[in-house]
Amino acid sequence: SLEKQGLLKRTHGGAVLNENALNEIKIPFLIRELEKSDEKIKIARIAAELVEDESVIFLDASTSAYFMIPFLAEKRNLIVITNGIKALTALSENNISCIGTGGEVINSCLAFVGEEAHRTIERYNADFCFFACRGISEDGRLTDISQPENSVRAKMLEHSKQAYMLCTSDKM
């Protein structure tokens, strides 16, 4: 039942959503891709304008970073390193030089994580890192539900000169 899964809480005469539990659900990439897509595309266009030709870029496995790819195709001689499986396909389709981190796959996120991903990231020093997360807490901390993805993201940030969080209005 939804109550046993912690998604609903019974009340007198009905049930209410457990908001905390909803924040812990891994929403599949294909669904996240549809959420706020117009806003993500606008953000992606602006973010891609920051990138110069011949840059080395880290993109995380977020849908927000994924939406940057068509706009990055307008740049010359980029190298993009990503842990995003769907991003690798889109980068290839747009003739952008790309490197996949490899590693263990999180199926719902279509993301590579783990030590193999870390080792690949450590071999590069990127000009830019573009990433997203589940939200921002009241005290300004980035929140997400996937510790393995957080770890990969942290490694990307550590090896980047500049980092930009791609954030839709619902995450603030």
Predicted segments — roles?
Residues T63, I85-K86:
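Alpha-helix/helix-capping structural signal
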Residues A65-M68, M172:
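Short glycine/serine/threonine-rich phosphate/pyrophosphate-binding segments
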Residues E3, R10, L88-M172:
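Conserved phosphate- and dinucleotide-binding cores of soluble alpha/beta proteins
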Residues E3-F58, I69-K75, T89-I96:
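HTH-adjacent hinge/linker in prokaryotic transcriptional regulators
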Residues L78-I81, C98:
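Short beta-strand element of Class I
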